[in-house]
Design a protein with these regions (language model features):
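Alpha-helical segments flanking ligand/cofactor-binding loops in enzyme cores
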Residues: 51, 71-72, 105, 117, ...
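C-terminal alpha-helix plus adjacent terminal tail
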Residues: 2-5, 13-20, 25-26, 123, ...
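Hydrophobic, secondary-structure "cap" segments at the distal end of domains
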Residues: 104-114
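Short acidic-hydrophobic, aromatic-tinged amphipathic segments that line or gate anion-handling sites
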Residues: 81-82, 137-149
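Extended, non-globular alpha-helical segments
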Residues: 18-19, 24-52
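Short, high-confidence coil segments that cap the C-terminus of an alpha-helix
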Residues: 4-7, 77
């Protein structure tokens, strides 16, 4: 944001997907509780989201090349493009957590209160056609064309006077600015407080959770995005059996029976994964 030679920003991800390859060790850098978790969630997470809207004074285009989690950063751009295979979700509740890191707030904002609450609280996935119909994205394009389309739009905007396209971008960001001023901090603190309660109880990552102390989520995410299980209305059987099905699915991957399209080095899964 401080580099004034940046005139238009395309926000995307390397490869065919959107930030789907989890780092099994990624949480170790701030796993000390409670100070580092507080600093990460209360300061870093909140500011990362706010900076996308308040600090970037030039037009922004989110280009999603495929499915993945923490899609909220792409939705914070002035215009968002996704490919036809993209799907998104707010998975927190199924892992026993509160969805307060921005994704739940985005669902409420773009889908409306009732529909947003439903998809947030049941963890059901939203597909690309639904994302377009419900106003989460601006366009849906064929696989491999998201960045190409983003560049085309950027070249169009480049024809405008610099000052005018910056002012236009400010107007585009206004609804999210007002939303974040009212609710973002409350959402962030709510997830943080609920997580710390589970840590204090010793239940974060228990046998009823899809999430094992936050650094073991890689395999579960791969399963959720590689199958269509999460696209259908959730029932108790689907909800309760998801961790077990993820383990069974990955055993088939390891045996070569099926292919994991989201290959990543999963080195730190807990022992209970291997029991299925």
């Amino acid at each position: 944001s401080m580099d004034h030679e940046n005139e238009i920003i395309i926000y995307t991800h390397i490869g065919d997907n959107w930030m789907i390859e989890s780092d099994a060790n990624g949480w170790e850098t701030y796993s000390e509780l409670p100070r580092q978790r507080f600093e990460h969630q209360y300061f870093d997470d909140t500011n990362l989201i706010k900076n996308m809207v308040f600090d970037l004074q030039v037009p922004t285009i989110g280009a999603m090349p495929g499915p993945g989690f923490h899609w909220d950063s792409a939705m914070l751009c002035d215009v968002t493009i996704c490919t036809e295979d993209t799907k998104i979700e707010v998975p927190h509740a199924q892992g026993g957590l509160v969805p307060g890191d921005g994704m739940g707030l985005m669902f409420q904002h773009y889908l409306g209160t009732k529909k947003g609450n439903y998809y947030m609280m049941t963890t059901r996935q939203v597909t690309a056609p639904q994302m377009l119909e419900w106003g989460l994205v601006s366009e849906v394009v064929p696989k491999g064309k998201a960045v190409e389309r983003a560049w085309e739009i950027a070249r169009m905007w480049k024809r405008m006077p610099y000052e005018n396209r910056c002012i236009m971008s400010n107007l585009a960001k206004r609804p999210l600015m007002k939303l974040f001023m009212e609710d973002l901090k409350l959402h962030t603190v709510s997830e943080q407080y609920a997580s710390l309660l589970r840590v204090a109880e010793g239940t974060l990552g228990d046998e009823n959770s899809a999430q094992q102390d936050e650094k073991y989520i890689s395999r579960v995410n791969d399963y959720r995005y590689a199958t269509k299980d999460m696209e259908q209305p959730m029932n108790f059987e689907l909800w309760d059996g998801m961790p077990k099905r993820a383990g069974e699915w990955f055993k088939k991957v390891e045996s070569g029976e099926i292919e994991n399209p989201y290959v990543f080095e999963h080195s730190n899964e807990p022992d209970w994964y291997n029991a299925f």
